[in-house]
């Protein structure tokens, strides 16, 4: 029986010599190694194999070096997976909108992945919010409404990501130490799925009498400054009313719900808020300058 126990310990601990007690050297290092792996894993949520490799290469107790090694491994794996998945279809994900605190600038983006399972995760939704926040920060304000071309999009993806601390509290965005491009590669590394910024649109209220409204259907954890859903719209109106901001948001909601093919058709629709009135009646002397409506996975 004693021989069997020793044989069992020898097989379990590999090359560690067991003669009734564990090697002191092995025993002293094990708790520290496991602690390093646990800490790094909780910090990054990276795969266990990459975390373990990084800790072993850095050496026990050298967490700073392990973090650097892990970061490189994640990027390497993400790059390989991105190359393999580049021809795959990614139609799941979210329409994400972000508007500045003063309401003068807004961005709408479609962020895609391959499965609804990944889209529903908090890390992916947080990434979508960081992407919208970053483009809101960097996109130019020299046009009232424009679709973002691939060249400008790719240039901004190389910038450091801007992270919103708390949009509900209207706190300032703060810069992270990694680029959006790196953030997307990391997400691909973690999920094994293709992740992409499919399209972007920016609006700027360049005249004091104009206001931008946003609305998302099926929004998750929406706030006045950020909304994330399956269908989204942005609209810019011209109005002398002091309530122009509330009016623009109401029109954005009507656009999402009624899916008009043109502005003239939208104006003829009955309002969802007051069925006795058309959208034209709701607007009164105000006018719709431009609007955009997207559905996730659309063109």
Swiss-Prot record:
Residues 1-18 form a transit peptide. GO terms for biological process: mitochondrial translation; mitochondrial translational elongation. Its main location: mitochondrion. SUPFAM superfamilies: Elongation factor Ts (EF-Ts), dimerisation domain. Gene3D superfamilies: DNA helicase RuvA subunit, C-terminal domain, Elongation factor Ts, dimerisation domain. GO terms for cellular component: mitochondrion. Keywords: Elongation factor, Mitochondrion, Protein biosynthesis, Transit peptide. It comes from the Eukaryota. InterPro entries: EF-Ts_dimer_sf (IPR036402), Transl_elong_EFTs/EF1B (IPR001816), Transl_elong_EFTs/EF1B_dimer (IPR014039). It is found in: Mitochondrion. It holds the Pfam family EF_TS. One of its GO terms (molecular function) is translation elongation factor activity. Belongs to the EF-Ts family. Associates with the EF-Tu.GDP complex and induces the exchange of GDP to GTP. It remains bound to the aminoacyl-tRNA.EF-Tu.GTP complex up to the GTP hydrolysis stage on the ribosome. HAMAP family: EF_Ts. This is Elongation factor Ts, mitochondrial.
